[in-house]
């Protein structure tokens, strides 16, 4: 474990020492871990327009896997489903545009949910997002509606009652913004979100019905250079006091104070660590120094987070205001290569398992053949990578790469940005399924030891 706030004069000496120590101590362990193969099963939810999904999953208390399939289509919104492992049955639950009360509006639809569900009192709380984009100069922006259609109305805070099978529509984001990040403080009845593209921080109070916009936190958000800043995708909450934590590409840790209804910058530490590499937060091609995915770990009253591209696991103690760099969760082939991963938009697939202390992580890493990193291209020209299942036992500080994931025909799941771990330890994700007319659907990876 590397302490995050080492004084600057001795920092490089510490880094060199730790790297050397890591090579000595971890090298044999990595060599001992054979890169095995796991065989995954794909499902057919019956939605031919399905597109890439980010988060949008949960293994709920009723044993079912809930998920959203997105659609980049002007006439069709994202669709919500459940999979019952006991019955081996998929059920279509609803259309996100209809759930938002916008059926027949003839506007840009609620094309996706970009957030993980939060379960509370038999309901799944989540938010909707836009899936209607244009790309210019490598910059993604909301596309204008075609003739005869209205602009995107804005993302919604929603809930789904698992027993009644009904949706509730609470509030809509301002200025036609999507909701790209969300979490819920179930104890205090608060939903929080960050909007796209401007990066407004929203809070919605379930009891009063009040939606408050605390303003932009990311300069011009993901709107344009040179003031562009990538918006945080994960908002872990400290249940003890109701504080919400988030980061920016510059490496600052921000804290929403429930007691003051205000946002402040944590002064004791930050994520600008040598271990994470050197990043230009302006480019938008990566996620800078901010965490990509993060969750609250109650046994230690701490946040566990993954940094994008490097896949380093971080631990943040909110009261001590201390960041520790723990372990690189990248696959064994990626770690051996010493390189970052090719795919820029992953690193969201982090979740606690059913035992409450094991982290599960899906990472798209290097393809290695004959001991060397191989470059393979997909039909669209993108570099292919192997999807690996990684686990990290927190109390034991034990990293395990369980191997690359393939379908029975040898094809690779791709574009994985989601994860849910069932009660039996099976790992579910939403992935590109090569050879299918639909692009993305549910995938199951069998339990591992």
Describe each PLM feature range.
Residues 41-46, 93-109, 168-177, 215-227, ...:
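Surface-exposed loop and turn segments in beta-propeller and other repeat-based domains
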Residues 44-78:
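Beta-strand-rich domains and repeat architectures in extracellular enzymes and scaffolds
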Residues 51-56, 101-116, 177-183, 222-236, ...:
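Repeated scaffold domains used in trafficking and secretory/extracellular systems
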Residues 60-62, 119-121, 186-188, 238-241, ...:
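Residue-level detector of Asp-centered blade-edge/turn motifs that repeat once per structural unit
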Residues 70-74, 126-152, 362-386, 433-440:
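Short, conserved, GDST-rich strand-edge loop motifs in beta-rich repeat architectures
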Residues 80-86, 144-162, 313, 378-395, ...:
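Beta-propeller blade signature
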Residues 306, 311, 339-394:
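Loop/turn-rich, solvent-exposed surfaces of beta-rich toroidal or solenoidal domains
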Residues 413-449:
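Blade-level signature of beta-propeller repeat domains, shared across WD40, Kelch, NHL, RCC1
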């Amino acid at each position: 474990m590397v302490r995050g706030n080492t004084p600057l004069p001795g920092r490089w000496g510490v880094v060199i020492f730790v790297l050397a120590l890591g090579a000595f101590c971890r090298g044999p362990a990595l060599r001992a871990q054979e890169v095995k193969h796991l065989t995954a099963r794909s499902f057919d939810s019956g939605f031919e327009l399905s597109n890439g999904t980010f988060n949008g999953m949960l293994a709920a208390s009723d044993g079912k896997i809930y998920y959203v399939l997105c659609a980049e289509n002007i006439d069709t919104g994202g669709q919500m489903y459940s999979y019952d492992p006991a019955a081996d049955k998929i059920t279509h639950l609803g259309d996100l545009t209809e759930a938002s009360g916008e059926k027949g509006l003839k506007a840009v639809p609620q094309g996706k949910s970009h957030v993980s569900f939060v379960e509370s009192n038999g309901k799944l709380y989540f938010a909707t997002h836009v899936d209607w984009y244009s790309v210019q100069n490598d910059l993604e922006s909301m596309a204008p509606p075609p003739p005869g259609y209205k602009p995107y109305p804005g993302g919604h805070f929603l809930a789904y009652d698992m027993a009644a099978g009904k949706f509730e529509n609470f509030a809509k984001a301002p200025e036609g913004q999507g909701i790209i990040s969300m979490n819920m403080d179930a104890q205090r009845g608060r939903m929080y979100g960050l909007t796209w593209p401007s990066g407004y921080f929203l809070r919605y109070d379930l009891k009063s019905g009040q939606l408050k916009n605390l303003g932009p936190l990311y300069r011009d958000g993901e709107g344009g250079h040179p003031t562009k800043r990538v918006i945080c995708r994960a908002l872990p909450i400290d249940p003890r006091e109701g504080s919400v934590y988030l980061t920016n590409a510059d490496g600052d840790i921000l804290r929403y104070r429930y007691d003051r209804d205000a946002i402040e910058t944590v002064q004791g530490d930050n994520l600008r660590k040598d271990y994470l590499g050197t990043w230009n937060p302006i480019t938008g091609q990566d996620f800078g120094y901010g965490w990509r995915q993060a969750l609250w770990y109650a046994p230690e009253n701490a946040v566990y987070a993954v940094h994008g591209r490097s896949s380093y696991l971080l631990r943040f103690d909110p009261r001590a205001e201390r960041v520790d760099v723990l372990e690189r969760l990248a696959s064994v082939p990626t770690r051996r290569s010493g390189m970052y991963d090719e795919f820029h938009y992953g690193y969201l697939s982090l979740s606690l398992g059913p035992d409450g202390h094991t982290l599960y992580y899906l990472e798209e890493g290097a393809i290695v053949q004959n001991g060397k990193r191989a470059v393979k291209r997909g039909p669209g020209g993108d570099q292919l990578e192997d999807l690996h299942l990684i686990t990290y036992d927190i109390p034991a500080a034990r990293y395990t790469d369980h191997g690359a994931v393939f379908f029975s025909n040898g094809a690779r799941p791709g574009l994985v940005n989601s994860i849910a771990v069932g009660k039996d330890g099976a790992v579910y994700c939403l992935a590109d399924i090569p050879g299918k007319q639909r692009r993305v659907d549910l995938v199951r990876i069998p339990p591992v030891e």
